[in-house]
């Protein structure tokens, strides 16, 4: 059975909806007067970059201000103390022949490699620790010498001039390093082998032939 809607009910529903709509659209205050919208002012916040009067000092910068050199100048690398230390290393003493430089580097490596092999080798708790450690250090010297020779063959061609720069970073002329040639690198590799084996023999002689009292067995 269909139900008919009375006119009174429709008027009540329409008046209720209109009153709700008016309440949502125009809210009223406590005094039943409609609230007025207070005009607001839009504030804009602007940030401006101000250039400093003096340029900031960069701690790390390219050497001589040239980024194409491919090296950076830092407070450590540009320190006179660090420069003095590096210039006194055997590999950077260009006034010394490559053969003597290789002997000096090899002596240091051979002498100091014996101790770790003796104390940390597989035969460290046996009576053969000294001999086994010395032979292992000598074997490592041979391997390093072969690697140095392979690097020289792959990097330098026989008869070509030195690949080292003939100018310093400040533009001063200098004699090219003879180590950066095929002949110079061959002498350095031979000197490293001779010095390394000599260092191993000298360390074994001091530890087990002279039996120095300060050596802790």
From Swiss-Prot:
Could you tell me which InterPro entries the record lists for this protein?
Answer: PSI_PsaL, PSI_PsaL_sf, PSI_suXI
Q: Which residues lie on this side of the membrane: Stromal?
A: 49-135, 211-217
Keywords in alphabetical order: Chloroplast, Membrane, Photosynthesis, Photosystem I, Plastid, Thylakoid, Transit peptide, Transmembrane, Transmembrane helix
As given in the record, the signal peptide range reads none
What topology in the membrane does the UniProt record assign? Multi-pass membrane protein
Q: Name one GO cellular component term.
A: chloroplast thylakoid membrane
Organism superkingdom: Eukaryota
Q: Where in the cell is it found?
A: Plastid, Chloroplast thylakoid membrane
Q: Which residues lie on this side of the membrane: Lumenal?
A: 157-189
Primary location class:
plastid
Q: Which GO terms describe its biological process?
A: photosynthesis
Give TM regions: 136-156, 190-210
Presequence range in chain numbering? 1-48
Q: Which family does it belong to?
A: Belongs to the PsaL family.
Which protein, by its recorded name, is this? Photosystem I reaction center subunit XI, chloroplastic
């Amino acid at each position: 059975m269909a139900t008919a809607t009375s006119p009174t009910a429709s008027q009540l529903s329409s008046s209720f909806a209109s009153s709700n709509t008016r309440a949502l659209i125009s809210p009223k205050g406590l005094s039943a007067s409609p609230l007025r919208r207070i005009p607001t002012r839009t504030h804009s916040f602007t940030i401006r970059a101000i250039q400093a009067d003096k340029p900031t000092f960069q701690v790390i910068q390219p050497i001589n201000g040239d980024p194409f050199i491919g090296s950076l100048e830092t407070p450590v690398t540009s320190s006179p103390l660090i420069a003095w230390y590096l210039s006194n290393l055997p590999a950077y003493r260009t006034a010394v022949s490559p053969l003597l430089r290789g002997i000096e580097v090899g002596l240091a490596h051979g002498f100091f490699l014996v101790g770790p092999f003796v104390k940390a080798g597989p035969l460290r708790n046996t009576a053969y620790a000294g001999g086994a450690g010395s032979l292992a250090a000598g074997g490592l010297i041979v391997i390093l010498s072969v690697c140095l020779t392979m690097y020289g063959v792959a990097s330098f061609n026989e008869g070509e001039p030195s690949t080292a720069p003939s100018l310093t970073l400040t533009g001063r002329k200098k004699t090219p390093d003879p180590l950066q040639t095929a002949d110079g690198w061959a002498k350095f590799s031979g000197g490293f082998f001779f010095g390394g084996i000599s260092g191993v023999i000298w360390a074994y002689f001091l530890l087990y032939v002279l039996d120095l009292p300060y050596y802790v067995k």
